[in-house]
Every structure is written in structure tokens, then in C-alpha cells.
Amino acid sequence: MVVPACVLVFCVAVVAGATSEPPGPEQRVVRRAAEVPGPEPSQQEQVAFGSGDTVELSCHPPGGAPTGPTVWAKDGTGLVASHRILVGPQRLQVLNASHEDAGVYSCQHRLTRRVLCHFSVRVTDAPSSGDDEDGEDVAEDTGAPYWTRPERMDKKLLAVPAANTVRFRCPAAGNPTPSISWLKNGKEFRGEHRIGGIKLRHQQWSLVMESVVPSDRGNYTCVVENKFGSIRQTYTLDVLERSPHRPILQAGLPANQTAILGSDVEFHCKVYSDAQPHIQWLKHVEVNGSKVGPDGTPYVTVLKTAGANTTDKELEVLSLHNVTFEDAGEYTCLAGNSIGFSHHSAWLVVLPAEEELMETDEAGSVYAGVLSYGVVFFLFILVVAAVILCRLRSPPKKGLGSPTVHKVSRFPLKRQVSLESNSSMNSNTPLVRIARLSSGEGPVLANVSELELPADPKWELSRTRLTLGKPLGEGCFGQVVMAEAIGIDKDRTAKPVTVAVKMLKDDATDKDLSDLVSEMEMMKMIGKHKNIINLLGACTQGGPLYVLVEYAAKGNLREFLRARRPPGMDYSFDACRLPEEQLTCKDLVSCAYQVARGMEYLASQKCIHRDLAARNVLVTEDNVMKIADFGLARDVHNLDYYKKTTNGRLPVKWMAPEALFDRVYTHQSDVWSFGVLLWEIFTPGGPSPYPGIPVEELFKLLKEGHRMDKPASCTHDLYMIMRECWHAVPSQRPTFKQLVEDLDRILTVTSTDEYLDLSVPFEQYSPGGQDTPSSSSSGDDSVFTHDLLPPGPPSNGGPRT
């Protein structure tokens, strides 16, 4: 039978690690079978496994062609990842298989529900013996196990940063074929003992742990044995916790360079940073004959900066081709992260071609001798004059008295940097300001205006063009007020624009000022996007620091959704009035899509948010979602995760396990938070995530693999996206780019007139079914799910009403 090319896929049942001897009672076997072309949806691949085996099913097309987003189902019901069931885009693993795992498994396209491949899985009582030949006839060279590659096992101590992947190998042989098992600190080590599980590659004699965290530290021992004996090897793993600090630049780089006219030059800059760094190469230039501005800061041009497809390795090298005399000068490597900035500079000297040098050699040697004598004599005269001048000006000595008091007009200062990310490379305007900020010792600023900040021409706004209005709210180190600004709109400079102004409180410290300046500089560096709160300007001269950002008229997303719930809900914002507008499925999907777009942009700029939630998404008058507070400098090591926010919510409920337990923050931990935000969107105006669950119980449930149940107004497809965001292994979660694509497809097929049935009782969200949001519970099945998903939606992939 000829299978059409468009549906041809390869379906693989993987059976690995089989030996000629039955495995011991503690051994776990991964069974593998040869790759075969995938059947049509009506066909099934028959596969048998032994009880206790690790089952691995794979489904992928020939030549690596993408199949699109997929889901796995058992007996027609969607599978959900857990500590025992690992679900990937094209691979399914079931650890410690039992009779309950027998059935028909299928891999389906997530949106079209087209079946890509079928497996009929049978689980028997006897463990698998693999595909090896029957080992009853013992060969002449029978004996105890031995290491086959001992030279690869010399490195017994492994120290890696958190979030890396670690592999331990113990390649061995023997007759009969030995079995391998693993111990951690002398005790049996299994996948359920670790968040994210482990991968046992029996055919490769290896143990793999992805996204390691500090709790993975310890001694790992492989035990290889058969009936003639056993051998073992112990490795020590040390996971280095990431600490917040500004980037560290390798000393001596970039180095000064001397080049011949027309040659090529490379500057190198080695950057070390746990937090994702931004790297830029700058060249110092002259403007109107001066290399510095009126405030003493240098003029520079940005030569190289991060793009969507550039890597840090590429940014660490600046290449100049066919250099000219105009290329000579000072170059700076600038690296920054959410903690601070570092920079090193080097000089390029361009010499004329060799023939020109030969002509000037003779004359140059004569002039050099005369010049050297002249310089020495001139320096001698200067030293004598300086000594005489100092003696004439020194006051007569007095007896012991009160110590001299020196008036300090500025606080002791640290260096900070101001960048403009979207300026032209050929611009001669000052693009970077290396300014001085107050020290971090923390005295109260009696008058913030005494601290002088450098003016940035692109962002500076005169205070006379700003009219402050009513307060909008308070933050951890400042307050936000509404204001009218003239000159923000470049097309209509005389028209006032409503803005939000961030400023410090009266009792602010110099650390608070440093944080506000850092937030402003981070917003400059990240640039503009429709779905983030953008910087509009700043007032840094002649008074306290004002940071002008976009104004969102409808407040944060949580209150926006809450105000639009139908009346009569126990937790509605105001049960006595009708909602402002009724939301449709498409409205909510649009909210999620816009937030995903904003996070995709922030990720492309290598910005990790670390506090993504509905409370930190603002809504404009035109219902545009804008992510806020992405530029805050958060000290993740000193943060009190148990402290409630001003609205009484615990930030821990939005945090990924690796961030919660080990304080490892990556773009993938932001993806977890996005999944919780999705739950908020489709539980409009409802309680906080994990309602009624105490924090201590929440920690336990997350470690056991429990996740929140599907909201009543959420479709199967959207809930599958949530569950993918909540995958225990960070690398298995989707990227924000993938989330944008998935939500775009769902948004396209969603009708504009499908209204949500939001009139669900509050018991839907409270485990105990109490009448008030303050009820507490240890967690019931109504909030968490650990089992299979409900049956899928219709084949068109659109949301159900």
C-alpha cells in the first residue's frame, strides 16, 4: 500500500538496555525496538513490555521534517505529564510500567487531531530480556564485569552551574552481560526521588539529569554486577548556585591593538555572568570637536549590539575590516544585566603602509632624539615649579585643635551606565552615558535633587512641560502619579499626553534612587514594543528624578477581568453593578496572545521578568495588554518569598519549582509563570492560584507533580498549553515564540461572538467548597489534577463555549 508523503511519519517503540540475564528486582529497564515506518491511523504497532520497565514511544517524520504541535493520548484520553509519565512533543516515557499502563497509545496533531501513529502496548509480569540472543550457553570467557573505558572515568568531581545538564557514565562489559544500578549518597536512586526525574541509558551505561539544582549535590555511585562479581564507581556532583552580580569581564580584554592601514582587526571581550548579559561594542567619537558632553560623559557610537539571532559568543568579538585612519581610537566592551553594568576599553592605533614607514624612518630617528631631551628638560622645570608653588601656598602649622571638616556636596558614588538601544550606528549623538550614582550604604536622602544625574538628550523632558496629577499607586521604593506631558508626541509637540510618572517617596534612600535609575536604564536598553510598558522620557535635572512611562487607563489585568465578571459572584468586584462589558472567548485568548508577544520580545532582548502575573500586566484604554515592571532590579537572594504583596497575594504561587526551591531564574521559569497567568485569565476575577492551599502544602504538592485543574471556562487546547508550561523539566516547556504561534492559531479559529459562561459557583475554585475566598484546605482533587485529562475538544481546535 502506498502511503501519501504528507502523512508519512516514523513511529518508534523504544526498548533499550536489554540483557541476556533477567534483571534484578531493583533494576529498571528501558525497552527499545527497531525503527519502523509509522502506520496509518487505522494500523497499530504491537509492543510488549515487562512489569517495571521504562516504556519509551517515539513518533517523528523521516528526515527530521516537523510534524507540528502534538499531544499523546491513551485509549482516546489525553495524557498529562507527571513524575512517572514524561510527555514530550514527539516522545512519551512511562516509568516503572504496570498492568494499568497497557492500552492503545496514539500521537495526534494538537490542533487538527490527526492521528500520526498508534501503539498497542501490552505489559507482562516477566521483565524484558531485550533483543539479545538467549544467554543459556555460557561462553568460554565468562567472568566478572570490567570497565571498558576507564580513561573516561578519571574525573570524579564535577562542578556545574545550576540549570545545566549532567551525565555520569560507567561503560562496562562482562559475560554474562552485567546489569547497572545507581545510588545517591549510598541509597537507591530513582526518577521519583528528583523533581524533573532522571534518564537511565542502560545501553550507554549512563545517568542523565537535566536542569540540575543545588539539591542535586551529592555522591552518585554506579553498581555494575553479574553472577561472577560486581564493580562500582562513585562521582561527586557539586551544583554551583547562581548569585546575583553584575557581569565580570576578563582582565586584559579587550587588548590594545596596532594595525597597518587596510588590514583586519579583532577585539575580544570575555564576559562571565550568571544573569543573562547584554553585550554592546562602542566607539568613542567626537562631537563638535569634543569627546565628552557638557556633563563630562563621553560621546560614543554603538557598533554592535544584541539582535534576535545573535549569540553571546558572537557578541564577544568585534571585527573591523580594511581599517582606515578614521578607525583609530578608543573602543569599549559594555556588558550589563539586571544587577548592573561593567565595561573595559582598548585603543586601536592605525599605522601607514610599510613603504611610507621606510621613507620616514631616518628623519624620525633624528627628531626622536631631540624630542626626548626636550621632554625630560620640560618635566624637570614643571616639577621644580610645582614644589615652589606648594610651599608658598601651604598654611602655617597650628597646634592640636578640632579636626578639619570637609563639606561633601555629593554622596560617595558608584558607576552606572545609560544606554539607548535603538539608535543609529552612524549617529553622532551621545548614545551612552557613563554617569555617577549614589553608593549603596543606604542613608536617607534629605533632598534627592542634590544628587546630580547626567542629562540624556534623547529622553530628557523639561519640568515646565510636565503637570502632575492624582496618585495612581505606591511601589516598594516609590510612587506613581498621573500627569500631563507636552512634547512627548513628536508629531504633535504641543498636544498634552497622559503619562504615568514614577518618582521616589520623601523617605527614599540612595539605594532606592539607584534602583529607580537602574529600572530607567534597563527600559532604555530593552527598547520599545507594543505589549510592554514603554519609557517615554525622564526629568533628571533641577529636581527629583521623574521617570515617565506609558499610562494604562484600565489598570492591571486582574482587576480588568474582575470588573467584567457577571454580577452575583461571591468574589466579584462589585456585585451591585453590571459588568462594564461582556467578554468573549476571543477576548481572553487575545489577552493571553498579547502577553505572550510581549514576553517573546523581552526574551529576545535577554530580559528575564521573574514576577510575571496578571497584577503586573496593565491594560490601556484600547484593551492593549502591556507587561510592566520588567526592568526592576530584584535581589532574588534576599527576597522574602513568604511575604504577602500589597494585595495580599503570595508571589510563590506564580514561581516555577526551580525558582521556588533553588532560586534559579531563566526564560523557562518565566514560561511557568505564564502558565499560571493563563489560569488567571480563564478564571476571570477569581481567587488567587491554588485557592485555599497553605504554602507548606503547596510545596509538597508541586514536588509530587500535582498541577491545578482545568478552569471551567477553559478549552482543552488552552489547558494543554498550561500543562506544557508547568512541565517539571524546564527544557521541556515551550518557548515564548512557540506560545505565540500556538495562541495565534487558536485565536484565528475562535469566533468573535462566543460568550463565556462565567456563572460558575465559587466551589469550582475552592477545594473545600466554602462560601468565602478565605477558606483554607489541605488541597483536594477539585483544585489539583494528577490524572489524565478529560476528552479533547472538537477537531477544529477552537475553544468551546
Swiss-Prot record:
CDD domains: IgI_2_FGFR. Residues 125-146, 762-801 are annotated as: Disordered. The modification Phosphoserine is found at residues 438-439. Residues 391-801 are cytoplasmic. Residues 766-782 have a biased composition (Low complexity). Disruption phenotype: Mice exhibit defects in their skeleton, including kyphosis, scoliosis, crooked tails and curvature and overgrowth of long bones and vertebrae. This bone dysplasia is due to defects in the regulation of chondrocyte proliferation and differentiation in the cartilaginous growth plate. Mice also display inner ear defects including failure of pillar cell differentiation and tunnel of Corti formation, resulting in profound deafness. Residues 790-801 have a biased composition (Pro residues). Residues 130-140 have a biased composition (Acidic residues). Glycans are attached at residues 96, 219, 256, 288, 309, 322. The modification Phosphotyrosine is found at residues 641-642, 719, 755. It holds the Pfam family Ig_3. Gene3D superfamilies: 6.10.250.1740, Immunoglobulins, Phosphorylase Kinase, domain 1, Transferase(Phosphotransferase) domain 1. Present in an inactive conformation in the absence of bound ligand. Ligand binding leads to dimerization and activation by autophosphorylation on tyrosine residues. This is Fibroblast growth factor receptor 3. The gene is Fgfr3.
